[in-house]
From Swiss-Prot:
Keywords: Cell membrane, Cytokine, Disulfide bond, Glycoprotein, Lipoprotein, Membrane, Myristate, Phosphoprotein, Secreted, Signal-anchor, Transmembrane, Transmembrane helix
Protein name: Tumor necrosis factor
Coiled coil: none
Residues marked Cleavage (site): S34, L35, L39, L40, C49, L50, L51, H52, T76, L77
UniProt GO cellular component terms: cell surface; extracellular space; plasma membrane
Sites where a glycan is attached: S80
Regions that span the bilayer: 35-57
Post-translational modification: The soluble form derives from the membrane form by proteolytic processing. The membrane-bound form is further proteolytically processed by SPPL2A or SPPL2B through regulated intramembrane proteolysis producing TNF intracellular domains (ICD1 and ICD2) released in the cytosol and TNF C-domain 1 and C-domain 2 secreted into the extracellular space. The membrane form, but not the soluble form, is phosphorylated on serine residues. Dephosphorylation of the membrane form occurs by binding to soluble TNFRSF1A/TNFR1.
Primary gene name: TNF
């Protein structure tokens, strides 16, 4: 065998041997391919689970569902607001210029007569049948207590069309002064508010009045202390 033949046989044998895949570049390439495959499989699995369990879905369906929920709510709010504007309501205050009597007035600031309620003969006239909140407050005061007890009353009455006699709906009595010596009375100025309120079934053209027994003790130092009103429910 010649030398050239031996060299050729060695080269052919080297070519026949499998080449190693090792080396820095080969290892990095295999690692990148494995990581990419893992991320791809994990992402596909996560997307499938989200779609399967309904966590995500078409935005169009979500938008339509939201609109279906909001539309009845908006309609209800609009209807409630419109109904509130149409209900009878009244709020009147006492006239401080009316000496010795409790005279209700509708011409001062923060007073209101709406949707059929009238103020006639110092009474509120109900325009329609229904449930009404009736309320009133008075404030009494004095510089000193007299030697005899003072009894203050506040009453809301109803004169109904179905029967002729006036009936008390709400009433309260208070006694801020229990009597005493003149020296004790001089040092004891007093204030006594009385608030009345309740819900009643009223009829059209019923007349409501709020009255007291001692108007001389009414306190008009601040506005909004003595008032009377109704609100349809």
């Amino acid at each position: 065998m010649s030398t050239e033949s031996m060299i050729r046989d060695v080269e052919l044998a080297e070519e026949a041997l499998p080449k190693k895949a090792g080396g820095p570049q080969g290892s990095r390439r295999c690692l990148c391919l494995s990581l990419f495959s893992f991320l791809l499989v994990a992402g596909a699995t996560t997307l499938f689970c989200l779609l399967h369990f309904g966590v995500i879905g078409p935005q169009k369906e979500e938008l339509l569902t939201g609109l279906q929920i909001m539309n009845p709510l908006a309609q209800t709010l609009r209807s409630s607001s419109q109904a509130s504007r149409d209900k009878p309501v009244a709020h009147v205050v006492a006239d401080p210029a009316a000496q010795g009597q409790l005279q209700w007035e509708k011409r001062f600031a923060n007073t209101l007569l709406a949707n059929g309620v009238k103020l006639e003969d110092n009474q509120l006239v109900v325009p329609t049948d229904g449930l009404y909140l009736i309320y009133s407050q008075v404030l009494f005061s004095g510089q000193r207590c007299p030697s005899t007890p003072v009894f203050l009353t506040h009453t809301i009455s109803r004169l109904a069309v179905s029967y002729p006699n006036k009936a008390n709906l709400l009433s309260a009595i208070k006694s801020p002064c229990q009597g005493g010596t003149s020296e004790e009375a001089e040092a004891k100025p007093w204030y006594e508010p009385i608030y009345l309120g309740g819900v009643f079934q009223l009829e059209k053209d019923d007349r409501l009045s709020a009255e007291i027994n001692m108007p001389n003790y009414l306190d008009f130092a601040e506005s909004g202390q003595v008032y009377f009103g109704i609100i349809a429910l």
